[in-house]
Amino acid sequence: MKTRFFAFAALALTLAACNNDNENLNDGPVAAKFTADIYESVSTRVNQDGTDWTDGDCIGITGAGYINIPYVRESGQFVPEDMTIYFNDTETKTFNAYYPYQAEGGTVSVSTAADKQDTGIDFLFASGATGSTYNREVSFTDKTKDGGADNSFHHCMSLIKFTFKAGDGISFSETEPVGYTLEGLKHEGTFDTATGTTAVTATSNTPITMQLDGATTSQVIILPQEVTSSLDLKVSFNGQSYKATLKLPATPTANFYTAGYAYTYIVTLNNKVITVSEPEITPWEPGDSNDASATL
């Protein structure tokens, strides 16, 4: 899976204006000008260095009578794919936006199966940004430091991260863990592009198997959900299967993987035993960390 990490990216989405900023704005439609930030603790979207969006990224914007209008990043800025958003009167308009763009819009189906584990399911949502003909800059940014609202992009999914370490009697010098299977989660659901909300639609748990390909870190994007059974981990190493039962989150909600939170497990393989840390909750948002032990 291609993983992209980032700390925080400020981006300007400039929509071609039909009027100069200093002109009389009552003479006709005025093109909106968008700016946007991704919440600073976000850590999976955008480029591998975690510093910027990638050309070709597409967001959907709704507001001022426009619904699900795609804007694509090209040469460092977001431009309308085929339609420009204009202010057609002097009233203040409110805008929402989401990533990644879905042509059908509305409530879309989501699968978090192993073959879907990429940025295409790392849904982001921003809301409440306003603008008008007199202030055409619509700012999807965090304004709380100035006493305003947080209108920046936030994660809508949850994230489980693993770091695999060699313990007593184990060495990764010649071979690393091949992969792992996680059981106890549901992987089918929906995302609402209008509200940024998710829902689980699967009625039963499905195991997910991830290949490590020589890496000792991995992550799984999941739908936010309550876990009602044990969360079992099997790690394949040197022809053996090491097993552990993971401790479920205690915060912010017990036994629940919460939207916007990342839960990190440190998995240590010892001779015939795995030790798994308490899940540490890290950006995206602060959270839990856990240890557990697993045996052959």
Segment roles from a protein language model:
Residues 2-296:
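Sec-type signal peptide cleavage vicinity
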